[in-house]
């Protein structure tokens, strides 16, 4: 249940690894608790 839980624009979390959120809150613990913070593709 990460949907609606992410309210950040940049994710710098490298401790989570799954696939649920496109961003992760500060601390990468709320949304990351079972999901993953994917860093925005800087293209």
Curated annotation (Swiss-Prot):
Keyword Magnesium: no
Residues that hold a divalent metal cation 7 according to the record: 37
Transmembrane segments annotated in the record for this chain: none
Key words, A-Z: Metal-binding, Metal-thiolate cluster
Record: residues binding a divalent metal cation 3: 2, 6, 11, 16
Residue ranges, annotated region (Alpha): 17-43
Region annotated Beta, chain positions: 1-16
Record-listed a divalent metal cation 2 binding positions: 2, 13
Domain of life: Eukaryota
PANTHER family: METALLOTHIONEIN, METALLOTHIONEIN-1X
Function: Metallothioneins have a high content of cysteine residues that bind various heavy metals.
Domain notes: Class I metallothioneins contain 2 metal-binding domains: four divalent ions are chelated within cluster A of the alpha domain and are coordinated via cysteinyl thiolate bridges to 11 cysteine ligands. Cluster B, the corresponding region within the beta domain, can ligate three divalent ions to 9 cysteines.
Name under which the protein is recorded: Metallothionein A
């Amino acid at each position: 249940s990460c949907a609606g839980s992410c309210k950040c624009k940049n994710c710098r979390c490298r401790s989570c690894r799954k696939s649920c959120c496109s961003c992760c809150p500060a601390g990468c613990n709320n949304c990351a608790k079972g999901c993953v913070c994917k860093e925005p593709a800087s293209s």
